[in-house]
Design a protein with these regions (language model features):
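Pepsin/retropepsin-fold aspartyl endopeptidases
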Residues: 1-130
Length: 130
């Protein structure tokens, strides 16, 4: 069973993304944030990824195409993400919240992503006014 990684298009550039259900948030390297042209400062906060502490100071709106599917969500800019099982650098760590929002289901045994429930329309339900 391998980790699921995919080539992702962000702003016309190709980046390597790893899909990690153990990570709540999505993280991107500085080069990816540059490609989004949407960096914004955030209140500094700490996070530990892979046993290594990081300080988050920026976020961006990640607009990407993955296997032909368009997604967008917020992502934190981070200084390092490590490498995949083949030693290739990881540029984007796709977290559980993004996968839930876009109904992306990782199938690790087959090293694939299931897009069966990818939304073409968002249905929002609002309670009736009082």
């Amino acid at each position: 069973m391998g980790r699921i990684t995919r080539e992702v298009d962000v702003g016309g550039q190709r980046f390597r993304a790893m899909f990690d259900t153990g990570s709540k948030n999505t993280y991107v390297l500085s080069a990816v944030a540059d490609a989004t042209q949407s960096r914004v400062p955030v209140q500094a906060r700490g996070v530990t990824l892979g046993g290594r502490p990081h300080t988050l100071r920026e976020a961006c709106l990640l607009r990407a195409t993955i296997e032909g599917h368009a997604i967008e969500d917020d992502a934190y800019v981070i200084d390092a993400l490590g490498h995949d099982d083949q030693g290739r650098p990881i540029d984007i760590l796709v977290g559980a919240l993004l996968m839930q929002k876009w109904c992306i289901r990782p199938v690790p045994d087959e090293e694939r992503l299931d897009w069966t429930h990818y939304p073409s329309v968002f249905n929002e339900f609002i309670g009736s006014p009082a």
